[in-house]
From Swiss-Prot:
It is found in: Cytoplasm. GO terms for molecular function: DNA binding. Coiled coil: none annotated. GO terms for biological process: regulation of DNA-templated transcription. It comes from the Bacteria. Belongs to the TACO1 family. YeeN subfamily. Its main location: cytoplasm. This is Probable transcriptional regulatory protein BPUM_0743. It comes from Bacillus pumilus (strain SAFR-032).
Length: 239
């Protein structure tokens, strides 16, 4: 799974270059999570998860607080959670998750992004079956052996543990996300380099240079869309 960890690193690195856009997306996601349940992460697991993710992207406290206060204030703005599936150049696969207050606008924007960049929209289920929803938690300062030991002590089962670039990455079932984090916290870990519930491809594909360039443009256009929260794909973008 090392390659998959590299794809997550590449995604985070690319997002560092557009922090204002990332903060806006987190603000929306935090607002929705807080509005759908209690605005307290201790009793709202969805909100707690988003806040843990936000920490790994260094989202400022004032953005988090503003989104939660907006939800507390009874704001009437409502968002729908949508998932689109499609194909890029040479049969590459893409999943797009969105939060939108205008479904027609978002569907049109996503369809146009695919159509103008060598891809096409698929029907629901046409792509997702080739991905596995996975909790991915990364920490520094622990070895693979230490991580295995602390998880065993906490009686937490995981799919895999990888050690790479001084970072230990744990892959687990989505419903084990908080248990894995809590096991690390009990062992003195306070910061996480990765804290995601993501869609990992079962197999990755490589593209020729021309197709790869077109595919990267497709992903860039999708991630630039205001309503798009996450983009997952099965292409190995390593050099």
């Amino acid at each position: 799974m090392g390659r998959k960890w590299n794809n997550i690193k590449e995604k985070k690195a690319s997002k560092d270059a557009s922090t204002s856009r990332i903060y806006a997306k987190f603000g929306r996601e935090i607002y929705v999570a807080a509005k759908q349940g209690e605005p307290n992460p201790e009793s709202n697991q969805a909100l707690r998860f988003v806040l843990e993710r936000a920490k790994t992207y260094s989202v400022p406290k004032h953005i988090v607080d503003r989104a939660i206060e907006k939800a507390k204030g009874g704001a009437e703005e409502n968002f729908d959670e949508l998932r689109y599936e499609g194909f890029g150049p040479n049969g590459s696969m893409v999943i797009v998750d969105a939060l939108t207050n205008n479904v027609n606008r978002t569907a049109s924007d996503v369809r146009a992004a695919f159509g103008k960049n060598g891809g096409n929209m698929g029907v629901s289920g046409s792509v997702a079956y080739m991905f596995d929803q996975t909790a991915v938690i990364g920490v520094e300062g622990k070895s693979e052996e230490e991580t295995l030991e602390l998880l065993m002590e906490a009686d937490v089962d995981v799919r895999d543990i990888m050690e790479e670039d001084e970072t230990v990455i744990v892959y687990a079932e989505p419903d084990q996300f908080h248990q894995v984090q809590e096991a690390f916290k009990q062992a003195g870990v306070e910061e996480f380099t990765v804290a995601e519930i993501t869609m990992l491809p079962q197999n990755e594909v490589t593209l020729d240079d021309e197709s790869k360039e077109q595919f990267e443009k497709l992903i860039d256009v999708l991630e630039e869309l205001e309503d798009v929260q996450q983009v997952y794909h099965n292409v190995d973008l390593g050099e």
